[in-house]
From Swiss-Prot:
<keyword id="KW-0547">Nucleotide-binding</keyword>
<keyword id="KW-0067">ATP-binding</keyword>
<dbReference type="InterPro" id="IPR006935">
    <property type="entry name" value="Helicase/UvrB_N"/>
</dbReference>
<dbReference type="InterPro" id="IPR001943">
    <property type="entry name" value="UVR_dom"/>
</dbReference>
<dbReference type="InterPro" id="IPR001650">
    <property type="entry name" value="Helicase_C-like"/>
</dbReference>
<dbReference type="InterPro" id="IPR014001">
    <property type="entry name" value="Helicase_ATP-bd"/>
</dbReference>
<keyword id="KW-0267">Excision nuclease</keyword>
<dbReference type="GO" id="GO:0006289">
    <property type="term" value="P:nucleotide-excision repair"/>
</dbReference>
<dbReference type="Pfam" id="PF12344">
    <property type="entry name" value="UvrB"/>
</dbReference>
<dbReference type="InterPro" id="IPR027417">
    <property type="entry name" value="P-loop_NTPase"/>
</dbReference>
<feature type="domain" description="Helicase C-terminal">
    <location>
        <begin position="436"/>
        <end position="595"/>
    </location>
</feature>
<feature type="binding site">
    <location>
        <begin position="38"/>
        <end position="45"/>
    </location>
    <ligand>
        <name>ATP</name>
    </ligand>
</feature>
<feature type="domain" description="UVR">
    <location>
        <begin position="623"/>
        <end position="658"/>
    </location>
</feature>
<keyword id="KW-0227">DNA damage</keyword>
<dbReference type="Pfam" id="PF02151">
    <property type="entry name" value="UVR"/>
</dbReference>
<dbReference type="GO" id="GO:0003677">
    <property type="term" value="F:DNA binding"/>
</dbReference>
<dbReference type="Pfam" id="PF04851">
    <property type="entry name" value="ResIII"/>
</dbReference>
Length: 658
C-alpha cells in the first residue's frame, strides 16, 4: 500500500490544526459520527485531506451534485497524486426511468444514454477498491444506488501469467463470461479481438492501455501493454490481473439459480392475478417476464436486468441491496465516509428512496414488474447512516440531525488560513434593486472582479440576464437544466473573465469556489422560503468570502427572521476572525486558486473548446488532448465519416500550434 500523503505547499493554519486533530482523534477512538462546521474559504477540503492522511484508511467522499463532485475530484487528485483517487457519479447522460400512469393507461419505456467515460471511471473505482488499499472515491449520491455483488465481481477476476498453461479457447470463453465482447473490427473498451495466437483485450476500466496476450501453443508466451491509440508497446509484464467488464456480472451457477427463483416468483404472482381475475395484468407480466427469462438464459442479460437484482445477487426480500459501500467493506477493514455539504446531501438520501419506491409500486401493481423489482433501489437514509464505521459531516451550516448524531464530536473551522473575514453585508431597498445593482456591477467590473446574482425565479433570472446584456454587461445565466460539463465550463468562463456577471436561482448549490467574486447580490432577500432561509442566505453570502473586497448586498423591504439570524452568524464569525487576526498579527489576503484542469468528461468538441481558451497548454496536457482526439478521428474514419475525421484532423493541428 502506498501511504496517503498530502502534497501541498501549505501547512495547516487558522482553525485547521485544531479541527484536524480533534476529528482524527475522534475517529481513532471509534466514534462513529463527527461534524466539521467550516465557513466558506476556510480550507475544509484541505482539512479533509489531512484527516485522511492522519487516519490512513480508504475514504468515500460524497456530495449532492456532479459539479461539486468534479471539483472535489480535481482537488483530491492534486492532494494525493501518488494514491488512487477515483470518481463515481451517474453514468447516464440522459435517463428516463420506466413508469406507468394508470389514469391515462400510459406506459413509459425506460430510455437512457450512457456516457462511456463515466462508466469507465465507475469501473475504475470498484476495481481500485478491490485491488488497492490507498483508495479515495469521490462520489455523488449515485454511490447509494444498487451495484452487483463484490463477491461475484471478485469471482470474475482472471489472472494471466507468462508461462501459464492455458488453452486459448479457454481464455476466450472466460472473457465472454466476464462480460467482454469480441470485436475484431471496431475495437473499444470492453472488447477483445483475436489475430492468430494473439489476443488483445481492452479492459473496460482502462483509460488508454490495451493488454496483449500472446500464446505459443497452450502456453502464454508474452503479456504486453499497448497504447490504445497508436498501438505502440508500453512495456512487458510477467503477469496481469483482469477484472470484469461491468459491476453486474454474475457467474453461471448464480445465473442458473437466479433463473429458477425468477420463474418461481413469476408463478406465484401469476397465481395471484388469476385468483383476483386480473387477466390483463396476468398476460402482461407473463409475456414480459418470460421474454426476459429467455434473454437472460441465452445471453446472460436483458433490458432492465437490474430489476432482477435481488435474484442475481441472492439477496432476501427487503434486504439491503449491494452498493458502492459494500466494495469498501469487502476486505473487512475500517473506512471513512465524508459527506460534504451534508445539510443538503443527507436529505437527498431519503427522498431518493421514496421517489423510487413510489414509481415501482405502480409498475408492480399493474403487472409490469415482479415484486422483487422493489428491491432494486437506492439505500434508505437509515441504511446509509448505519452502514459505515465512521462518518464525517462537513458543512458551513449543518442541520440539526448532523449535530445530534455527532454530539460532542464537533469541530469549528471559522478562522481562514488566509485571514479573510466573512464579507461585509448591507441591506438595500428592493424597490429599485435592478437599477441600483447595475451601478454596483460597473464599479466591480472596473476593478477586474466578478459578480454573482441570485434571483427567485427562472423567468426573473432570464430577464435580468437579458436586461444587463443589453446594457453592455458581459453576463451569463446558470440554471438547473444545464448539464455538469457545461456548468463547469460556465464557472471557468467566469473565472477567466470571459464574462463578469453570473446570474442564477440557487447558486449556493452549484459548488462554486470563485476567488474572483467580490460582490454577491441577493435579490428579494426578504421573501421567506427555501431559497431565502437562514441556511441558504448564509451559504450564498459565503460565496463572497474568498475575496479581500468581498461584499454582500441584500435587497429587501424588511428584515426577516432568516435574514436576522444569517446576519448574526456573519457578525459572530467576523468578530472571531478579527480577534484571531489581531492576536496573531495576520493581514487578510484574497484566496489564490489555479484554474485546475477540469474533469475530462467532454466530447471531442468540448475538449477543443477548452483547449482553445488557454493561451498556453502544458505539454503533457496538450498531448493527452491530442491522443483522445486522434482516437476519435480514427473511429470516425472507420465509420466512413470522413468529414468528421477531417474536422478532427484540422482541430488537432490547431492544438499542436497552441
Amino acid at each position: 500500500m502506498q501511504p496517503f500523503k498530502v502534497h501541498s505547499p501549505y501547512e495547516p493554519a487558522g482553525d485547521q490544526p485544531q479541527a484536524i486533530e480533534k476529528l482524527a482523534q475522534s475517529i481513532q477512538t471509534q466514534h462513529r459520527y463527527q461534524t466539521l462546521v467550516g465557513v466558506t474559504g476556510s480550507g475544509k477540503t484541505y482539512t479533509m485531506a489531512k484527516i485522511i492522511e492522519k487516519l490512513q484508511i480508504p475514504t468515500l467522499i460524497m456530495t449532492h451534485n456532479k459539479t461539486l463532485a468534479a471539483q472535489l475530484y480535481s482537488e483530491f487528485r492534486g492532494f494525493f497524486p501518488k494514491n488512487h483517487v477515483e470518481y463515481f457519479i451517474s453514468h447516464f447522460d440522459y435517463y428516463q426511468p420506466e413508469a406507468y400512469i394508470p389514469r391515462q393507461d400510459l406506459f413509459i419505456e425506460k430510455d437512457s444514454s450512457i456516457n462511456e467515460e463515466l462508466e469507465r471511471l465507475r469501473l475504475s473505482a470498484t476495481t481500485s477498491l478491490l485491488a488497492h488499499e490507498d483508495v479515495i472515491v469521490v462520489a455523488s449520491v449515485s454511490a447509494n444506488y444498487g451495484l452487483g455483488s463484490p463477491a461475484e465481481y471478485v469471482q470474475m477476476i482472471q489472472k494471466l501469467e507468462v508461462g501459464e498453461r492455458l488453452h486459448q479457447r479457454e481464455l476466450l470463453l472466460r472473457l465472454v463470461e466476464m462480460g467482454y465482447k469480441r470485436n475484431d473490427n471496431f475495437f473499444d473498451r470492453g472488447d477483445f479481438r483475436v489475430n492468430g495466437e494473439v489476443i488483445d483485450i481492452y479492459p473496460a476500466y482502462s483509460e488508454d492501455e490495451v493488454v496483449r496476450v500472446e500464446f505459443f501453443g497452450d502456453e502464454i508466451e508474452r503479456i504486453a501493454l499497448l497504447d490504445s491509440v497508436d498501438r505502440q508497446a508500453l512495456g512487458e509484464l510477467p503477469s496481469y490481473i483482469l477484472y470484469a467488464a461491468n459491476q453486474f456480472i454474475v457467474g453461471q451457477n448464480r445465473l442458473h439459480e437466479a433463473l429458477k427463483t425468477i420463474e418461481s416468483e413469476l408463478e406465484e404472482r401469476l397465481a395471484f392475478y388469476q385468483k383476483e381475475g386480473r387477466m390483463v395484468e396476468h398476460a402482461r407480466l407473463k409475456q414480459r417476464t418470460e421474454f426476459d427469462l429467455e434473454m437472460i438464459g441465452a445471453t446472460g442479460i436483458c433490458k432492465g436486468i437490474e430489476n432482477y437484482s435481488r435474484h442475481l445477487t441472492g439477496k432476501k426480500v427487503g434486504e439491503t441491496p449491494y452498493s458502492l459501500l459494500d466494495y469498501f467493506e469487502f476486505k473487512g477493514k475500517p473506512y471513512l465516509i465524508i459527506v460534504d455539504e451534508s445539510h443538503v446531501s443527507l436529505p437527498q438520501f431519503g427522498g431518493m428512496y421514496a421517489g423510487d419506491r413510489s414509481r415501482k409500486e405502480v409498475l408492480v401493481e399493474h403487472g409490469f414488474r415482479l415484486p422483487s423489482a422493489l428491491d432494486n433501489r437506492p439505500l434508505t437514509y437509515e441504511e446509509f447512516i448505519t452502514k459505515a464505521p465512521h462518518y464525517l459531516f462537513v458543512s458551513a451550516t449543518p442541520a440539526p440531525r448532523e449535530l445530534e448524531l455527532s454530539q460532542a464530536q464537533i469541530a469549528e473551522q471559522i478562522v481562514r488560513p488566509t485571514g479573510l473575514l466573512d464579507p461585509l453585508y448591507e441591506v438595500r431597498d428592493s424597490q429599485n434593486q435592478v437599477a441600483a445593482l447595475f451601478d454596483e456591477i460597473k464599479a466591480v467590473v472596473a476593478r477586474g472582479e466578478r459578480v454573482l446574482i441570485t434571483a427567485l425565479t427562472k423567468k426573473m433570472a432570464e430577464e435580468l440576464t437579458k436586461y444587463y446584456a443589453d446594457l453592455g454587461i458581459k453576463v451569463r445565466y446558470m440554471h438547473s437544466e444545464i448539464d455538469a460539463i457545461e456548468r463547469n465550463q460556465i464557472i471557468r468562463g467566469l473565472r477567466t473573465g470571459e464574462f463578469d456577471v453570473l446570474v442564477g436561482i440557487n447558486l449556493l448549490r452549484e459548488g462554486l469556489d470563485l476567488p474572483e467574486v467580490s460582490l454577491v447580490a441577493i435579490l428579494d432577500a426578504d421573501k421567506e422560503g427555501f431559497l431565502r432561509s437562514e441556511t441558504s442566505l448564509i451559504q450564498t453570502m459565503g460565496r463572497a468570502a474568498r475575496n479581500l473586497n468581498g461584499r454582500v448586498l441584500l435587497f429587501a423591504q424588511k428584515i426577516t427572521p432568516s435574514m436576522k439570524r444569517a446576519m448574526e452568524v456573519t457578525d459572530y464569525r467576523r468578530s472571531k476572525q478579527q480577534e484571531f487576526n489581531q492576536k496573531h498579527g495576520i493581514t487578510p489576503k484574497s484566496v489564490t486558486r489555479k484554474l485546475d484542469e477540469e474533469l475530462r468528461l467532454e466530447g471531442v468538441g468540448d475538449l477543443y473548446a477548452k483547449a482553445s481558451k488557454k493561451e498556453k497548454i502544458p505539454k503533457a496536457e496538450r498531448e493527452k488532448i491530442i491522443k483522445e482526439m486522434t482516437k476519435k478521428m480514427h473511429e470516425a474514419a472507420k465509420l466512413l465519416d470522413f468529414e468528421e475525421a477531417a474536422r478532427l484532423r484540422d482541430e488537432i493541428a490547431k492544438i499542436r500550434a497552441l
